[in-house]
Amino acid sequence: MKKTFYHYMMKHRAALFKNEISDLAEAMYDDLSFPKQSEDYDVISSYLELSGMLESMSIFDDAWDLYIQER
């Protein structure tokens, strides 16, 4: 069974060393409207762009690349 992007990112919460990806994971956790069941890049990317959660979408792109590598 594949993990959703949200489920994958939860392992980055409460990281020992804070970085942009761990900050994104915390923000996703706090956002009750985040599309938690999605595995679709376009759905998640659009949501993040419209929500204004990120200063730069490159943070999401980096997190997505890690997600794809570990699937």
Swiss-Prot record:
The record's section on InterPro entries has:
UPF0346, YozE_SAM-like, YozE_SAM-like_sf
Pfam families linked to this entry: YozE_SAM_like (PF06855)
Instruction: State the source organism's domain of life.
Output: Bacteria
Gene3D superfamilies documented for this protein? YozE SAM-like
The family classification in the record reads: Belongs to the UPF0346 family.
HAMAP family referenced in this protein's UniProt entry, alphabetically: UPF0346
Protein name as it appears in the record: UPF0346 protein BcerKBAB4_2120
What is the source species? Answer: Bacillus mycoides (strain KBAB4)
